[in-house]
């Protein structure tokens, strides 16, 4: 069947985007960067435990440990990257203040870090953002601004950034953010040196990229698997396309994994270090969430359960009986939403 002009236009645009990505020089993130970040942020973050669960180990047929980032400062791993980025600002950037976009957890992490450093912080969020996450952003002294949806937040934020001259801290593409998130990977390998597979939840890919750099640099044999919601597959689509893409519509119960666009820096690291990225359904995420709540008594948000769902379904590809670790990425729960989905 001959191609229509519309089909050819789309194909040409994809080829151009792929060529542009291939020409783009992105910053590298190394194990040394991550070790330096760990030293820089250590007074302000928790070294979260890897919690053992006999029940989840039985369900997954692996020896599963849970990296408890829901117990982190601000209730999510995001504080790690935000602190590293804020502490590496130049004096001129500090004076300008920082702005970002977030479904909530990165915004709270950046607000927390900015409060420590005495830097003005503005966070753009979707109007449907979880109220407790909005309250956290404001509670740490940042200004919360809103756009109609997650898909439109970037444009609103970017316009504000231009008007006010603020420094943009990318939620998952800033190399200093990625290095900060990678400190969780350092801890995983140090605390569970026999781990064979690490499953990491994926929104934009900053945590996945950081953990993968750290883990693979320290233990090349370890498998690192990203776990992404089926309704927000921006990293999966970007890997298939061969360049970072934007998705027009996001539909997932895991609001913390709802990035509408990918980034060249994190994508390049994922391509280099990550073994696989798998998709999980909302039902699979909810099933894992229910199991975590019932059997471990840990209060996590849906995004925090995504990595566990990949082991429960077998999608993570772990060998039976092997040592595994899943990230519990956050615990900032919307209780009304929790009642609805459970």
Give, region by region, the residue ranges found by the protein language model:
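PLP-dependent amino-acid enzyme catalytic core
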Residues: 2-342
